[in-house]
């Protein structure tokens, strides 16, 4: 009798478990729960995607500036009479690379930060408005007659 009692007890346990298992499945297939979930999921994904895209663009810009600087640095080395072998082999001239790397970091920092430091190399009216107008307005009257006479 104990065997049949155990079987009936286990069947009763299974019988009580099957409705419990079907309960959450019915809740998961409830259309109201599905309608409330997607609006919460998609904006979160978009919000997380946008900063990642901005970081990638910033990385691309940094890569471009560093490539441009390295090209300029190798051209400067070639102008000084150094061969490409000296540039490509760091072990032969370690002091050369120790002097070039800090300059590369400083140059990269200058390229990434638009500050009033670059204007001496080029004319930027928006960068320094206090000293630039006086310098730009005084030379043209003196230079304009020479420019016109040279054209005529």
Curated annotation (Swiss-Prot):
A Pfam entry, by short name: SEEK1
UniProt-annotated stretches for the region Disordered: 1-39, 132-152
Listed Polar residues bias regions: 1-31
InterPro entries xref list: SEEK1
Name of this protein: Psoriasis susceptibility 1 candidate gene 1 protein homolog
Species per Swiss-Prot/TrEMBL record: Pan troglodytes (Chimpanzee)
């Amino acid at each position: 009798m104990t065997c049949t009692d155990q079987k009936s007890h286990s069947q009763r346990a299974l019988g009580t478990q099957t409705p419990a298992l079907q309960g959450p499945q019915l809740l998961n297939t409830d259309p109201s729960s599905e309608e409330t979930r997607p609006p919460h999921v998609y904006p979160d994904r978009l919000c997380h995607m946008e900063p990642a895209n901005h970081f990638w663009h910033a990385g691309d810009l940094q890569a471009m500036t560093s490539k441009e600087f390295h090209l300029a640095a190798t051209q400067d080395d070639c102008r000084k009479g150094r061969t490409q072998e000296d540039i490509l082999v760091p072990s032969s001239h370690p002091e050369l690379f120790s002097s070039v790397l800090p300059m590369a970091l400083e140059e990269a920092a200058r390229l990434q930060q638009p500050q009033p430091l670059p204007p001496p190399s080029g004319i930027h009216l928006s960068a320094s408005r206090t000293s630039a107008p006086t310098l730009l307005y005084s030379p043209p009257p003196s230079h304009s007659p020479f420019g016109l006479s040279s054209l005529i």
